[in-house]
Swiss-Prot record:
Highly expressed in the kidney, moderately abundant in the retina, and even lower in the liver. Expressed (at protein level) in the small intestine. Expressed at lower levels in brain,lung, and retina. Glycans are attached at N124, N135, N483, N492. It is found in: Cell membrane; Basal cell membrane. GO terms for biological process: bile acid and bile salt transport; intestinal absorption; liver regeneration; monoatomic ion transport; monocarboxylic acid transport; organic anion transport; sodium-independent organic anion transport. It comes from Rattus norvegicus. The gene is Slco1a5. Optimum pH is 6.5 with estrone 3-sulfate, taurocholate, prostaglandin E2 and L-thyroxine (T4) as substrates. The chain crosses the membrane at residues 21-40, 60-80, 87-111, 156-184, 204-224, 243-267, 312-333, 354-377, 382-405, 514-536, 546-571, 606-623. GO terms for molecular function: bile acid transmembrane transporter activity; monocarboxylic acid transmembrane transporter activity; organic anion transmembrane transporter activity; sodium-independent organic anion transmembrane transporter activity; thyroid hormone transmembrane transporter activity. This is Solute carrier organic anion transporter family member 1A5. Residues 1-20, 81-86, 185-203, 268-311, 378-381, 537-545, 624-670 are cytoplasmic. GO terms for cellular component: basal plasma membrane; basolateral plasma membrane; brush border membrane.
């Protein structure tokens, strides 16, 4: 008997360490995959500028991750449970690393980045063709040299990023469905919310690192080390600036490959957490029988696929959850993917500043919310139903607060000929014949060039030539333009490189926007886990992996892939001025109509989120009559523990045992 107790105790320690170690390894994998994903999102603007592509193509590149995920999600979710899940997760992490490495290759295969400019790196009178010079022919038109047009084919290098992101999506496929199902299979049902909360925290810690990495890389010039940055005429706030995006992808590749190592040492199955509490070994015998039954089912690996699909499609709560998720994810992907671009244009910040602010303000409350709701559900034994009702009310409250964002806005950058007249009067639409004015009509300036300068009068101009400037002093970003005929001020009628900065009032509004985002992020994190628990518990245990995979499949097909594409195309329609390539073709957008941009960015997600509350309300109604498997399992566990107590009491009170046993069964039924 002593040997049996010793064996049970040893098994308890081993079981505890394995399930916790797997949770730790999976959390690390979540950190690495979310690090790569968030870094990719922070670098979208840099990729857009590097390859001179419109936002719609950038959205397609971003959505290509979901395409890669889509290729294998159903296969992995169903057949993956029949195979060695930890090893499949490890292989997926390696593939993610290879995808990140491929995404960094264009930097090494293409030449140096040449931003659109007419300004010479040095200031000397013989090269000042970018200034206002009367009685000259217009020589600043896009070059039509065929040799230079061939060089522009290098812009197709973005295909490497596209393919690399697809491969990264393929590698990410097994991590969530197989990892979640592995924990759900071998963890106590009451521990699942806490474990999932820990995993979600890992998904938040990864973005924290990713945003810090993105902010750092965005502040470094893309060709640092190979060019003299003192000769640059652009700063990180310029829409032509490209940060060192490739450095972060190399780091992400290494982190993903390292995260794969622990999974190759985990067994295919683990003992169910908590089974060691039964000293008679009854539950251990049941577990062994369950293992044998699973082995028999593996011989017919495909026979249950169609019945499972039919069962899931006939589950009303599950199907409504998919509809709700599709609408919500459409909204959140659109908002999050283009949040850096929106803050850059709305509040006049650089990519590095914006990315850092997003990380500092948004991610800590999300992390706290994930841990808090997981702890509360475990500590106070809150049922999935109660948590779902609470999540719905909080989410609706946060949705109403969202409309305050419409009041936290700034005006367009005042650019003469684009968003304002040369007298400084703002006008909403761009009219091309207003780019030229009496003050610069004799300068023979190009109307397509984009070398913005800020005048002493607080008004920006598309170029020093269009500002009527006839002289320049200094070099690089310190260059100053003087004798500008279009600048009417009490000073020297001079201008400096770059757009004019927005005032302190706009900076204060940015703080209000970030505070609102903190509240929204915290409430979102609290409502996310109850919603995910409803998804896990509304389907049968044997259908769990397939159900998770099908849910991911639908959200990718109807949200993850199309959302950034159509949203990017809508953003492109708000562009006021496109960059110009050497062959005269349009490049990346340099200036947006921020009023139209704001309407698209805020209104469309609001409409999508608002429509998602209707199916969510039907879910709450259907849940009243639905018995969740997790709640049944919990009651059966209590009944088993009660029966053990009853057996002990039979030794002293034979007549009392039937009454206690019946009471326990009655409580279970209630």
């Amino acid at each position: 008997m002593g040997e049996t107790e010793k064996r049970v105790a040893t098994h308890e320690v081993r079981c505890f360490s394995k399930i916790k170690m797997f949770l730790l390894a999976l959390t690390w994998a979540y950190v690495s995959k979310s690090l790569s994903g968030i870094y990719m999102n922070t670098m979208l603007t840099q990729i857009e500028r590097q390859f001179d592509i419109p936002t719609s193509i950038v959205g397609f590149i971003n959505g290509s991750f979901e395409i890669g995920n889509l290729l294998l999600i159903i296969f992995v979710s169903y057949f993956g449970t029949k195979l060695h899940r930890p090893i499949m997760i490890g292989v997926g992490c390696v593939i993610m690393g290879l995808g990140c490495f491929l995404m960094s290759l264009p930097h090494f295969l293409m030449g140096r980045y040449e931003y659109e400019t007419t300004i010479s790196p040095t200031s000397n009178l013989s090269s000042n063709s970018f200034l206002c010079m009367e009685n000259r022919s217009q020589t600043l038109k896009p070059t039509q040299d065929p040799a230079e047009c061939i060089k522009e084919m290098k812009s197709l290098m973005w295909i490497y990023v596209l393919v690399g992101n697809i491969i990264r999506g393929i590698g990410e496929t097994p991590i969530m469905p197989l990892g979640i199902s592995y924990i759900e299979d071998f963890a106590k049902s009451e521990n699942s919310p806490l474990y999932i909360g820990i995993l979600e925290t890992g998904k938040v810690f990864g973005p924290i690192v990713g945003l810090l990495l993105g902010s750092f890389c965005a502040s470094i010039y893309v060709d640092t080390g190979s060019v003299n940055t003192d000769d640059l005429t652009i700063t990180p706030t310029d829409t032509r600036w490209v940060g060192a995006w490739w450095i972060g992808f190399l780091i992400c590749a290494g982190v993903n490959i390292l995260s794969s190592i622990p999974f190759f040492f985990f067994p295919k199955t683990l003992p169910k957490e908590g089974l060691q509490d039964d000293v008679d070994g009854t539950n251990n015998d049941k577990e062994e029988k369950h293992r044998e039954k699973a082995k028999e089912e593996n011989r017919g690996i495909t026979k249950d696929f169609l019945p499972f699909m039919k069962s899931l499609s006939c589950n009303p709560i599950y199907m409504l959850l998919i509809l709700t998720s599709v609408l919500q994810i459409n909204a959140f992907i659109n908002m999050f993917t283009f949040l850096p671009k929106y803050l850059e244009q709305q509040y006049g910040k650089s990519t590095a500043e914006v990315v850092l602010l997003i990380g500092v303000y948004n991610l800590p409350p999300i992390c706290i919310g994930y841990l808090l709701i997981g702890f509360i559900m475990k500590k106070f034994k809150i049922t999935v139903k109660k948590a779902a009702y609470m999540a719905f009310c909080l989410s609706l409250f946060e949705y109403l607060l969202y409309f305050l964002h419409f009041m936290i806005t700034c005006d367009n950058f005042p650019v003469a000929g684009l968003t304002a007249s040369y007298e400084g009067v703002h006008h909403p639409l761009y009219v091309e014949n207003k780019v030229l004015a009496d003050c610069n009509r004799g300068c023979s300036c190009s109307t397509n060039s984009w070398d913005p300068v800020c005048g002493d009068n607080g008004l920006a101009y598309m170029s020093a030539c269009l500002a009527g400037c006839k002289k320049s002093v200094g070099t690089g970003t310190n260059m100053v333009f003087q004798n500008c005929s279009c600048i009417r001020s009490s000073g020297n009628s001079s201008a400096v490189l770059g757009l004019c900065k927005k005032g302190p009032e706009c900076a204060n509004k940015l703080q209000y926007f970030l505070i609102m985002s903190v509240i929204g992020s915290f409430i979102y994190s609290i409502t996310a886990i109850p919603g995910y628990m409803v998804l896990l518990r509304c389907i049968k245990p044997e259908e769990k992996s397939l159900g998770i995979g099908l849910h991911a499949f639908c959200t990718r097909v109807f949200a993850g892939i199309p959302a950034p594409i159509y949203f990017g195309a809508l953003i492109d329609r708000t562009c006021l001025h496109w960059g110009t390539l050497k062959c005269g073709e349009p490049g990346a957008c340099r200036m947006y109509n921020i009023n139209n941009f704001r309407r698209i960015y805020l209104v469309l997600p609001a409409a999508l989120r608002g429509s998602s509350y209707l199916p969510a309300l039907f879910i709450l109604i259907l849940m009243r009559k639905f018995q969740f498997p997790g709640e049944i399992d919990s009651s059966e566990t209590e009944l088993a523990e009660m029966k053990i107590t009853v057996k002990k009491s039979e030794c002293t009170d034979v007549h009392g045992s039937p009454q206690v046993e019946n009471d326990g069964e009655l409580k279970t039924r209630l």
